[in-house]
């Protein structure tokens, strides 16, 4: 009955000129917004840390340039100047009332950091197909041994049980 219904449905769709499987729009981009925002955030953080590291190395190699950079960061920014502010700098310069106002942002940032740490501990290893086959064979052999062990144990239990005629 069910098979007949499906056949009638398919033939009816084809008879009308419609394809059996309705055409769906596959042009929709699926984006995991949380993952994208976390990666974007941590890419910015990494760039800031790398920039800071480079500036520190430059200031060690060229002390006069480092003083000039430090002086320029203390002055108010001019139009078009890039400013990189890290969370540590913000914590030192903000008052407690400002921190309370930005508490939700800080909580969000902390959650993002924790999520990134979790993701960074997740590793995906690609295993060659030969290894997969070897592993599968080993696993099948383990299962066979455990089944044969269970069968031996149950056979021993059965042979040691008193039969109904012995009672």
Swiss-Prot record:
Superkingdom assignment: Eukaryota
Q: InterPro entries given for it?
A: SPATA19
Please state where this protein is localized: Mitochondrion outer membrane; Mitochondrion; Cell projection, Cilium, Flagellum
Q: What is its main location?
A: mitochondrion
Residues of the transit peptide: 1-24
Return the Pfam families for the record: SPATA19
Where Phosphoserine occurs, residue numbers?
26, 129
- What does the UniProt keyword field contain? Cell projection, Cilium, Developmental protein, Differentiation, Flagellum, Membrane, Mitochondrion, Mitochondrion outer membrane, Phosphoprotein, Spermatogenesis, Transit peptide
Q: Give the tissue specificity.
A: Expressed specifically in testis.
Biological process terms from the Gene Ontology for this record are: cell differentiation; sperm mitochondrion organization; spermatogenesis
Q: Which GO terms describe its cellular component?
A: mitochondrial outer membrane; mitochondrion; sperm flagellum; sperm midpiece
Question: What residue intervals traverse the membrane?
Answer: none
Q: What does this protein do?
A: Essential for sperm motility and male fertility. Plays an important role in sperm motility by regulating the organization and function of the mitochondria and is also required for correct sperm midpiece assembly.
Q: What is this protein called?
A: Spermatogenesis-associated protein 19, mitochondrial
Species of origin? Homo sapiens
Gene symbol of the encoding locus: SPATA19
